[in-house]
């Protein structure tokens, strides 16, 4: 049997709404009319007058202003709306009724601001409450806070956070993406007790707190934690106090560790036992156990409670954390209690994150194929929480971390830092190089790292930790090719690392690129300059805030750039443009390995005209003269690899007439070139012969004449003896050219 409804403008309007709704095709005509009836019973007709604000009666607006939440217009305070009809009703509100409300608020925006700026205003006056629950009103309240009197602000904030509407929460979240708006809310909530209590009780607290506290802990967290203590003394708000306390302590305990006191522990243990909130109290204690000062209090005051709840996984986790400080030998047995249940949840991940700093635990994880397989599976879950993803990344970092050999200066700094922190370190055999390399191999076998790369696309907080992981993994030479295959290079060249100039990401890049053929990696779609730019920044850094020693890092960057410089002209050009200022300084570095690596890099770069111009540019430039002086000096240094590289640079410089003339402008002869023939190293002799061929084949007669006049130049060339056929051929070519030109000049 169908029920006919009299046609009215409101009914026609609602029918039109249903007709245009995307969900409407699933309802029969009767169901649509039933929806209309229920909505009318909920006095939705009063809300529809928003479509024509000029005809709104004061009594209707007063009714709307007294609604606790705008959603009550469609959720039927008088009649319970059936669950199968709630979706369409909410859609009617959010898509059809809310926009007219916002339009109405926009029209009267200036009038409202003038009205609300009066010091004598009563915040409950019609129709302020409704206005400030609209998206436009929320924006005006937060963005124009200086216009609104403080008393009114506090009231409106209370009303704002008292609203259970997700629309209200989402609008606050949107506005709080701006730092100024977040600061306003932080300051306002800190001084507004009622608004804070409403904030704590808001059903959208998790969303709102994540947005408001996104810049890190603030004094507000400490104030809210104290509010929770007071709220817990009221029976109706005990559950919400326990629910909120754990996350608040995480933010306020670093600066207020004394919040966990014997009195607090006694009071909340009693509350938990009386109200059946033991698990919630254990979660709070677990958070507090992350702080050394708090562990002492908890160990003394709550040990009995923890023992009484020993079947709880959180209680086992707390026991493990306390064992770290009071009975280290019990850490692994306690961890095994969690592992034996084969439950791979957040509790286990936190336990592994905490304990995997210990060598035996690292090996325990590596030997448990079931555990590694489940860690890999957890990362496939698109709904994995940021904390769980971070825990897995931390576990992997601990497992693949090598013991780093730092420079003497860096060791002294670390020693002083450790003394200041009174930290204790234990050397485990599992931390030696061979076991660490085997663990890295296991991690790669289970494909955990590539899944972490995918997770990092959703959680930016993983990026820094993954860069640190890759620094250590790339230290294992046999893993480098596999790292390239799973996308490590593309991950390390993400824009986020370039913007933050992440040193660890650049170090990892360098380590991988030292021993991988560039042509097998870089393409037009993925050019080498993507890697060159971040590595170039490391050459000038002196920051100690890295996973690796600075000097070693710079050395490896130079080696990686040397490899890239052999790739193509575009790479050489990019390196010259990005790194030359640093190379000018590093080539005179007192550390012989750094100087050698720099010279070898410039040798490869000298194939490019962009590099050569740095030596043979302007005639009277001090910069070019100084660089050439340094290279000439290095061609006679004691370190053979450095000599070889410097002589290689001279080969390229002498390949052009301007380069030969530049040498003559500094030395007036080619003595440095001739001297290469007397070196004991055949590689240097080879370079010397090529230089001589470049000179004697020059069409510039002045260059040729200067060589002939160089003391003992021709004599040294004629008397040069070698068993190498290639060198004999070069010697012969040079002598033939000399004799030919001398004969022609007669």
From Swiss-Prot:
<dbReference type="GO" id="GO:0043022">
    <property type="term" value="F:ribosome binding"/>
</dbReference>
<keyword id="KW-0963">Cytoplasm</keyword>
<dbReference type="GO" id="GO:0051879">
    <property type="term" value="F:Hsp90 protein binding"/>
</dbReference>
<dbReference type="GO" id="GO:0061077">
    <property type="term" value="P:chaperone-mediated protein folding"/>
</dbReference>
<dbReference type="GO" id="GO:0110085">
    <property type="term" value="C:mitotic actomyosin contractile ring"/>
</dbReference>
<dbReference type="GO" id="GO:0051083">
    <property type="term" value="P:'de novo' cotranslational protein folding"/>
</dbReference>
<dbReference type="GO" id="GO:0033275">
    <property type="term" value="P:actin-myosin filament sliding"/>
</dbReference>
<protein>
    <recommendedName>
        <fullName>Ring assembly protein 3</fullName>
    </recommendedName>
</protein>
<dbReference type="InterPro" id="IPR011989">
    <property type="entry name" value="ARM-like"/>
</dbReference>
<dbReference type="GO" id="GO:0005737">
    <property type="term" value="C:cytoplasm"/>
</dbReference>
<keyword id="KW-0131">Cell cycle</keyword>
<dbReference type="GO" id="GO:0051301">
    <property type="term" value="P:cell division"/>
</dbReference>
<dbReference type="GO" id="GO:0044183">
    <property type="term" value="F:protein folding chaperone"/>
</dbReference>
<comment type="function">
    <text>Essential for actinomyosin ring assembly during cytokinesis. Has a role, in conjunction with F-actin, in assembling myosin II-containing proteins, such as myo2, at the division site.</text>
</comment>
<dbReference type="GO" id="GO:0017022">
    <property type="term" value="F:myosin binding"/>
</dbReference>
<keyword id="KW-0132">Cell division</keyword>
<dbReference type="InterPro" id="IPR016024">
    <property type="entry name" value="ARM-type_fold"/>
</dbReference>
